[in-house]
Every structure is written in structure tokens, then in C-alpha cells.
Amino acid sequence: MDLKPIVALDLPDPSEALKLVHLLRPHIDFFKVGSQLFLAGGTDIIRRIIDCGADVFLDLKFHDIPRTVFRAVTEVVKLKVKFTTVHILGGREMLKEALEASAGSDTEILGVTVLTSMDDRGLESIGIAHAVEEEVLLLASMALEVGLRGIVCSGKELPLLGKLKKRASILVVPGIRWRGAAAYDQKRIIEPGEAKKGGATHVVVGRPILEAHDKVGLVQKLLCELNAIN
């Protein structure tokens, strides 16, 4: 299985998040910490997950003036997380500063294209007149030209990114749902197997696992599905 699943710890309570890490750790070795859990648990939650032998994806989606992002990424690197995110919309200079701050570290900077909660109408409402697919291609192309190696996009755009002259070596896909499951606030969703077929290197699964009665069972189902696809 080349594609690696990441479980999103979208929980308000650090102790509950750590319980879930311990429960799933025999099967999963990569966990995402977003803004809610990071604000609740601080840097300690990052260290405790890493102490469990797992990698951490710190998903704070930095989008600020270039020097502020440089300073933020400088602090993130000290935590020894595997991935962290910046909004590509912050522009070339901001992306360059993020890369400079992470240089020489093991922390990979991922560029966020268009949130999976957005669709064409959502983009139009904030003044972006073209379709999601066009915006994702534009942003991903710019990020890769600047030097980022990783892109975050929905599974719907994977085929388009595969046609770019410069390819991303890391493609992280959130918005993972099984057929028939509630989409909630996600607009652009995909099943895990389809994401793998499309070329994703990582899928982020949160709510389906968090809300499952048998969390381990669902993770095992996920791994079986991914292993079955060559």
C-alpha cells in the first residue's frame, strides 16, 4: 500500500485525542492536528503523539504576510512535525519564506489549494470568477514553481494535477467519505479507493472514524480497501 492514511484528530479534548491515538496506533502511524486541538493541547499534544511513535501533520493553514509565516514555520519546525500547511493564496513571497524557514528540516510544507468545503458558487461569492478546477491548477502550478513538493487538494482535482509539467511528489486528499455517508460541510468528496487510483499519496480521514461505533473496525476496512488496489 503506497498511499498512507492520516487520521484527523478533530477533537476538543487532548486526553480524548490521545486515547484515540493509542487505540489506533497499532494500525495508523500518522495523525493530523488541526487548529481546535492545537489550541486546546498546545505543543504538548504534538510531543505526546510523536512519543507514541507516530508522525504528526500540523494543519494550521498559515496565511499571513511573508515574514510572519517565516517566523511561524520556524517554530513549527522545532516541533519535528512531518507536514504543515500554508494557503497558496498567500502568494509567492509567502511560500518562499515558508520554504526558507523549513530548509534543512524534516518538516514538509504543503500548499493548500481550495478548501473542500468550497465549490464554484463559493469561489464566486469571494470574487473568484473561474471554476474550482481552474483555481486549483493555478495555485498548484504556482506553488510547485516556487519549490513546494506537496499539495493539498480534493480528490476531484487529482487527474488535473497529474497533467501539470511539474508534478507534486506529495498529494494529500481530505474530504474522504464512503458512499452513502453524510458529506456534512464538505462539497468535494471522494472515496478512499478512488483517491488512491487518482494518484493521492495520503488521504485524511476524520469525521467518519471519529463518529464510528467501531473505530478500529473502520480503520481496518480502510486499510483493506487501500491494500486491494494496485
Curated annotation (Swiss-Prot):
Positions of the catalytic residues: 61
Keywords on record: Decarboxylase, Lyase, Pyrimidine biosynthesis
PROSITE patterns assigned to the protein according to its UniProt record, in alphabetical order: OMPDECASE
Pathway noted in the entry: Pyrimidine metabolism; UMP biosynthesis via de novo pathway; UMP from orotate: step 2/2
Source domain of life: Bacteria
InterPro entries in UniProt: Aldolase_TIM, OMPdecase, OMPdecase_AS, OMPdecase_bac, OMPdeCOase_dom, RibuloseP-bd_barrel
Binding site for substrate: 10, 32, 59-68, 116, 177, 186, 206-207
Annotated GO CC locations: cytosol
GO biological process, one term: 'de novo' pyrimidine nucleobase biosynthetic process
Keyword Lyase among record annotations: yes
Main EC class the enzyme belongs to: lyase
Function comment: Catalyzes the decarboxylation of orotidine 5'-monophosphate (OMP) to uridine 5'-monophosphate (UMP).
Family under the similarity heading: Belongs to the OMP decarboxylase family. Type 1 subfamily.
Subunit structure of this chain's protein: Homodimer.
Protein name (Swiss-Prot/TrEMBL): Orotidine 5'-phosphate decarboxylase
Species this chain originates from: Methylacidiphilum infernorum (isolate V4)
Upper lineage: Bacteria, Pseudomonadati, Verrucomicrobiota, Methylacidiphilae, Methylacidiphilales
